[in-house]
């Protein structure tokens, strides 16, 4: 986004369309031109209502027309922009890089400390240099600027870009560059670890009222302890790339790095002529977006000129818009499940995306399977990674096929469990490959028999409604257990024990659900709530809609309850 008005108008549009949204990202160039790269200040005149002011026009980003009439801005300052987003019950993240342009105060300070790495980085030919995150004094300077110029305005989260860092025109001698901990050759791979560490530790020392959230392009082993959420970089919008992203995410999980995501739809849409109206791109984006529901972080992103807000894909009644809207709502209905699974990651060193070998080690067919995985312990997810409803001509223009001819995709159901189709409620035996019909709005999702799923309310943002009236879907066929985790949602009081857990247990033979005593407490905790219980079967408790009838509704006040179903 190139101005506060543009960013805030996107939030407005989502609220107007009643499509859920929790976060929006201010990407680069709020600082201005490349020579002023990553000044960690809002110096672009469009962000501070200084268009036409000679003192600030020198910072206008490269390529923007100095004589263009942008009109009188509605949002006139960065603080006003951040406050506006907050009033719309959303959060804002901002891009911060690991390098600095020669005009910046940060460049001068790092240079005086001998904490710049002197090799070519991006953007080229602007004199930009990476900093030395191995140097604790450099990390102090880095955070001090972030805090003073951005965090103190109310910023919620950080996009730490180029944490490799970008290394252009690579020469072997570049790796002999000296850092605080020795040659760059020796410590290169730990660059993101140290850069993320600096931001995390400084923000934690500043306040415990706001959780640290770091989105970073690169990772190193152990980086998860710094609230680091990795994304897979600027990947191209192609079906083959989407397939490879699946393997990438699962490999991250196997390295013990649980929070990972990919640019939904890909970043560079070259293969679609950089045209968001290309119908073939719509199909790819929809399928990638559907998969995003079952990633630890769900986030759309693309490179200009392609914009990927939902309204770029048509309107209600258009298949691409409807599919995107459907899966956005599905993500929000799964929040109690996802948040509880995240607690398992924190408390038990678990993972959210789970390669099938983790849960089915005796099934040799899944040992190297990279087309499907478990999302938490209950969901089997099989993203659709082939084009079924569009095609492209030699000029890469997209064309739509007859969508009444439903395509299919292979799904393998692992041995050692029975599986219930999330959409239909049909129970299937494990150890078989089936051909699942996949209309454009259906991605294959199966729930392990012997699962308990808390189904959240329909909301426009994650904390809009309390979880005081939850549907509990029980997938029969085996005993089940699930622990519902809750806390204050945005501080570190949980580290001091301020949280609660409620364990639900299903006895399949007796068809009884036991809801144990609630353990723990926190400020604002619900004292009473309703659990609406439903045992899933075909036509009952299926899919992404609300159930209108239940097997039993229970008023729960924190004491053990047993329900016969």
Predicted features and spans:
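Catalytic-domain carbohydrate-binding cleft regions of carbohydrate-active enzymes
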Residues: 1-442, 447-448
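Accessory, solvent-exposed terminal regions and/or long lumenal/extracellular loops of proteins
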Residues: 442-565
């Amino acid at each position: 986004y190139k101005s506060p008005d543009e960013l805030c108008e996107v939030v407005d549009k989502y609220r107007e369309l009643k499509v859920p949204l929790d976060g929006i990202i201010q990407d680069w160039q709020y600082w201005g031109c490349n020579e002023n790269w990553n000044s960690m200040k809002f110096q672009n005149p469009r962000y501070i209502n200084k268009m036409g002011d000679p003192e600030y026009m020198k910072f206008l980003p490269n390529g923007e027309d100095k004589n263009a009439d942008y009109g009188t801005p509605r949002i006139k300052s960065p603080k006003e922009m951040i406050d506006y987003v907050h009033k719309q019950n959303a959060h804002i993240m901002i891009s911060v890089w690991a390098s600095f342009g020669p005009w910046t105060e940060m460049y001068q300070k790092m240079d005086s400390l001998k904490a710049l790495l002197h090799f070519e980085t991006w953007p080229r030919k602007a004199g930009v240099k990476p900093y030395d995150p191995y140097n604790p004094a450099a990390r102090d300077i880095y955070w001090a600027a972030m805090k003073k110029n951005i965090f103190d305005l109310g910023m919620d989260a950080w996009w730490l870009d180029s944490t490799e860092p970008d290394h252009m025109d690579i020469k072997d001698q570049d790796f002999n560059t000296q850092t605080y901990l020795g040659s760059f050759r020796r410590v290169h791979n730990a660059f993101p670890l140290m850069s993320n560490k600096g931001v995390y530790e400084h923000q934690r020392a500043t306040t415990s009222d706001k959780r640290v959230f770091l989105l970073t392009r690169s990772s190193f082993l152990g980086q998860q302890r710094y609230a680091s959420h990795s994304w897979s970089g600027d990947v191209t919008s192609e079906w083959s790339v989407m397939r490879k992203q699946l393997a990438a995410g699962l490999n991250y999980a196997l390295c013990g790095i649980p929070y990972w995501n990919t640019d939904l739809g890909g970043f560079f849409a070259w293969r679609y002529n950089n045209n968001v109206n290309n119908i073939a791109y719509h199909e790819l984006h929809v399928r990638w977006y559907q998969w995003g529901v079952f990633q630890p972080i769900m986030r759309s992103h693309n490179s200009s000129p392609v914009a990927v807000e939902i309204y770029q894909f048509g309107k209600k009644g258009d298949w691409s818009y409807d599919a995107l809207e459907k899966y956005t709502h599905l993500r929000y209905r799964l929040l109690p499940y996802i948040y509880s699974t995240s607690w398992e990651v924190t408390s038990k060193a678990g993972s959210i995306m789970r390669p099938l070998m983790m849960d089915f080690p005796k099934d040799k067919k899944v040992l190297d399977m990279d087309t499907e995985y478990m999302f938490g312990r209950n969901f089997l997810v099989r993203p659709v990674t082939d084009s079924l409803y569009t095609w492209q001509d030699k000029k890469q223009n997209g064309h739509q096929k007859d969508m009444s001819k439903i395509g299919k995709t292979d799904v393998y159901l692992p041995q050692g469990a029975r599986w219930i189709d999330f959409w239909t409620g049909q129970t299937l035996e494990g150890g078989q490959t089936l051909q699942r019909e996949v209309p454009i709005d259906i991605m294959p999702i199966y729930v392990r028999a012997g699962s308990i799923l808390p189904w959240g309310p329909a909301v426009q943002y994650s904390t809009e409604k309390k979880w005081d009236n939850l549907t509990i879907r029980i997938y029969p066929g085996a005993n089940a257990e699930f622990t519902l985790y809750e806390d204050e949602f945005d501080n570190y009081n949980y580290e001091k024990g301020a949280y609660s857990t409620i364990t639900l247990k299903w006895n399949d033979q007796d068809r009884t659900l036991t809801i144990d005593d609630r353990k723990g407490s926190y400020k604002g905790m619900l004292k009473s709530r309703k659990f609406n219980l439903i045992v899933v079967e075909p036509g009952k408790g299926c899919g992404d809609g609300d159930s209108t009838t239940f097997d039993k509704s229970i008023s729960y006040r924190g004491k053990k309850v047993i329900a016969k179903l």
